[in-house]
Amino acid sequence: MARSTARKRALNTLYEADEKSQDILSLLDERIAHPGAQTPLPDYAIEIVKGVAEHRRQIDMTLDEHSTGWKVRRMGVVDRNILRIAAWEILFTDDVPDKVAIDEALALAKTLCDDDSPAFIHGLLSAVCTAKNAAPAPESVAEEADEESSDSAAAASEPTDEGDVSDSPDSSGASDEPAAPSAEIQPTVD
């Protein structure tokens, strides 16, 4: 229950920053220093707000990429920030299972959004999860590239039977093999 409350408090902060067109981290600093009538923000709410602020551009690009018919900037403010919280948990945290992130987003949407929002949010977050699970993790792409580079270097240093080095890779590092797929999200063009 504590994390559910933290998500709601993080949503309130993100919503307020979005509505006021205020810098998220500046507003967060204000809320931490002067919580007002509310209890201080839970640590997990602070972590969410900082995480969304740090990764907002990538989160929004990912949501835009997987959204059908709606760009993030056109979504309702509450919907948009519920999606940002869940996308941050899905893409950037390891301690929250994807299903939990989706279920928590749906719980917020059912109480705070219109009747169509939960289905839209569920579909969009499911697409984000599917894409995340289909793509190699950034660490594994880097490890594969390191292994390929080590294999190429080892093969280049091995002498051939005839002493011919024409089959070794050239010194420019060019290779006939395709490059490993990029794990970065590419922006979409409207």
Swiss-Prot record:
Region (Disordered): 135-190
Keyword terms: RNA-binding, Transcription, Transcription antitermination, Transcription regulation
Family, per entry: Belongs to the NusB family.
Cited Pfam families: NusB (PF01029)
Source superkingdom: Bacteria
Acidic residues composition bias: residue spans: 141-150
An individual GO BP term: transcription antitermination
Protein name: Transcription antitermination protein NusB
One of the record's GO cellular component terms: cytosol
Entry-linked InterPro entries: NusB-like_sf, NusB_fam, NusB_RsmB_TIM44
Record-linked NCBIfam families: nusB
GO function terms (MF aspect): RNA binding
Function comment: Involved in transcription antitermination. Required for transcription of ribosomal RNA (rRNA) genes. Binds specifically to the boxA antiterminator sequence of the ribosomal RNA (rrn) operons.
PANTHER family xrefs: ANTITERMINATION NUSB DOMAIN-CONTAINING PROTEIN, N UTILIZATION SUBSTANCE PROTEIN B-RELATED
